[in-house]
């Protein structure tokens, strides 16, 4: 009830399950959506994967693997997108979080982590810490970021 009430108060439109199921839209080319959140001294990260077309049965990408696609702790939060196998092999989000713990600013972390990925590997990252917020991607990825303040 809390989330639904908040969404309605923000002007979000409601639709029935039938409307969602019968849009006729092809969802085979979906993308990952990620966010990092700061609420005072608390941080969180969330990801929703679009997956990949023609995945090998049983494939597990970076999103459900904590420390790979996302990570958060008392110092900040990280969310990544792109080539899931490359992100998972590098434990990307956890390693980026370690840079937060070492006192690095998010604006410095983003290009540092992007450099871990060789072209043409698609990669993007968003980082928030007590020192600020930053996001970026290599040339293989389109991305956008938004910073908002919500008062409840």
Where would I find each of the regions flagged by the language model?
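N-terminal nucleophile
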Residues: 1-152
């Amino acid at each position: 009830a809390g989330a639904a009430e908040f969404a309605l108060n923000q002007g979000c439109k409601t639709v029935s399950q039938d409307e969602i199921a019968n849009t006729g839209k092809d969802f085979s080319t979906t993308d990952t959506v990620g966010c990092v959140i700061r609420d005072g001294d608390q941080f969180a990260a969330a990801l929703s994967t679009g997956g990949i077309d023609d995945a090998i049965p049983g494939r597990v990408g970076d999103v459900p693997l904590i420390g790979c696609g996302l990570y958060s702790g008392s110092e900040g939060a990280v969310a990544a997108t792109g080539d899931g196998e490359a992100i998972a092999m590098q434990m990307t989000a956890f390693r980026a979080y370690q840079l937060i713990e070492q006192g690095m600013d998010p604006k410095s972390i983003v290009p540092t982590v992007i450099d871990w990925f060789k072209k043409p590997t698609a990669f993007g990252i968003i980082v928030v810490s007590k020192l600020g917020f930053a996001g970026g991607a290599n040339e293989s990825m389109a991305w956008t970021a938004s910073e908002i303040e919500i008062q409840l």
